[in-house]
Amino acid sequence: MSITASEARQNLFPLIEQVNEDHAPVHITSRKGNAVLMSEEDFTAWTETVHLLRSPRNARRLLDSIAEAEAGDATEHDLIDPDAERA
């Protein structure tokens, strides 16, 4: 969806609800520059993804791991609970 800054201003609260419900960003156009309105949840996920893929070495490692899992070559492990009492 793409709207003008004036339309965004008039409908800000419904737009905030919309991006949180459908997780589709809203493109806002203006003569002074364009912007995007997205949910905080989506923004956080996006910034985490950018952080993880910023390093070419880490990106390759993650993509290789995904490929292994999709090929059925992954090994399942139990997670260690750091708060569990030690025997």
UniProtKB/Swiss-Prot annotation:
Please, which domain of life does this record's source organism belong to? Bacteria
What keywords are annotated for this sequence in UniProt? Toxin-antitoxin system
GO biological processes = regulation of DNA-templated transcription
Q: Using the chain's own numbering, where are the disulfide bonds?
A: none
Gene3D superfamilies linked to this entry? 1.10.1220.170, YefM-like domain (3.40.1620.10)
GO molecular function annotations of the record: DNA-binding transcription factor activity; sequence-specific DNA binding
User: Which parts pass through the membrane?
Assistant: none
Q: Which InterPro entries match?
A: Antitoxin_Phd/YefM, phD/YefM_antitoxin, YefM-like_sf
Q: How does it assemble?
A: Forms a complex with YoeB which inhibits its toxin activity.
Q: What does this protein do?
A: Antitoxin component of a type II toxin-antitoxin (TA) system. A probable antitoxin for the putative mRNA interferase YeoB.
> Which protein family is named in the record?
Belongs to the phD/YefM antitoxin family.
In Swiss-Prot or TrEMBL terms, this protein is called Antitoxin YefM
Q: Native species of this protein?
A: Streptomyces coelicolor (strain ATCC BAA-471 / A3(2) / M145)
